[in-house]
Amino acid sequence: MFYYNDNRIKKRCALLMSIVLLVCLAAVLPMQVRAADAAIYPMYQRAVDFPQGDLSRLAQVIRKAQAGGEINIGFLGGSITEGRGAANVQDCYVSQVYKWWYEAFPLAQINVINAGVGGTSSYLGVHRVDAELLVHKPDLVFMEFAVNDTFTEFCMNSYENLIRKILMSESNPALVLLFATNAVGDSSQAVQAALGQYYDLPMISYGKAVTPEVEAGSFTWFQIAEDIVHPNNMGHSIFAGLITTYLEDLCAKLDTIEVDAARLQQYELPEPVTMQVYQNAHIENAATITPLEVLGYDVYDFNYHFGDNWYSMQDGSYISFVVEASNIGILYQRTVEGTFGQYDVYIDDQYVKTLDGNYVEFYGTETEAEELFASPDGGKAYHVIKIVKNPTSFNTDFVIIGLLVS
């Protein structure tokens, strides 16, 4: 149950209502001005219309902030979390949520780690979460992969592995699942929310909040988004407002939430639903692994987020590695520049697949993560990975960002 009788909740909902009304008025939509309850409460109630989840970890973070402690808040996700669509960094939902914490708890030291990377799924997330987020010992993590993950067993597996990694990390962080959506309402929310319920986690859905409003004509999708996926300033404000309203609600009922610190320290995860194959997942790059053989590749920081890449620009180039793993993937760059070619991957002398560095879009680049090998029995062994230019590829450029190893 959620309570709205606290003045802070009313103020937050009033802010959300003003956002929605500004969207509508900006387009001069033929609609009636609705009361606050009718305009906002349904949006917020839909957004949090999940089983409540275990709030003890989150309540512990709030109490630590109230006491003036240092709070590390992590955000893990794709381009929406990175801030795509917002005009400026301060306009993205992550910055707005940070501002709420900063203003709500002036005695606390609030640190935010934004580990959002555009175009990436939970498969890459489970390989990078240790180095990019968990190393900072977060007290609270917000995670959003609903748009970039697909309705597949593969993504369900990586998403659950990621949940377990975060919950069992050294700092015992609270974890809140976020679900974005796109213009046609597609997302992997159903699968991810089922896992969230299984692990008794708090959840907030931007999709459940805005999609019915778009369908009802309260506002159009492109009044809250810059394209079919990414929220604009207004969309980011709505997303942030849903999260901060949820936090206001939690503050209002904080005294009713019991926290057993000893039990949290001895927390044991329930049995996994999927195979646990990514618990030791990490990324190997040019700074951490030496090629077995290499010709025509230079070490270069091509990717703005992931440094120490291998970059080939010549015909006949090849590179090979030896890794001990039960699962092997690759992270490589795709671009619209028109100079990137196709490269073949072999593992233990067996052809696996062809990677296409050419990105068929109107603009930009894409950081592509693909699994190449999965051990049938989950056992580790040494494997040789070789990457060579496809003989039919006219273009020669190719960037290997790293190997995904677990």
Residue ranges and their predicted role:
Residues S79-E82, N232:
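Ser/Thr-glycine-rich phosphate-binding loops at phosphate-binding pockets of nucleotides
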Residues S79-I80, G116-G118:
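Catalytic nucleophile serine of serine hydrolases
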Residues M1-G74, T81-N88, P106-A108, S237, ...:
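N-terminal secretory targeting modules
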Residues C92-N111, T120, L124-D255, W310-G316, ...:
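Alpha-helical cap/lid subdomain in secreted, periplasmic
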Residues L76-S79, F219-W221:
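Short glycine/proline-rich turn/loop motifs
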